[in-house]
Amino acid sequence: MNKPVKKQQPKKVIPNFEYARRLNGKKVKIFLRNGEVLDAEVTGVSNYEIMVKVGDRNLLVFKHAIDYIEY
């Protein structure tokens, strides 16, 4: 007997993503895992990256490279 194949449910959005999205447009201080600190403005957030503006440069920072964020 063949069992019916269940369709995979779409992944739910984790609360941390919603929290990070609220930082959009705010000035923050991002502490990276390598010890660097970025004084930046958050311009965009996706599942794995945060887009920030540091001075006149736009940077794409991977979330796994972030230690913590102060705002």
Swiss-Prot record:
Disulfide bonds: none
GO molecular function term, any single one: RNA binding
Domain Sm residue range list: 15-71
Family annotation (Pfam families): Hfq
Single Gene Ontology BP annotation: regulation of DNA-templated transcription
This protein's name: Uncharacterized protein MJ1435
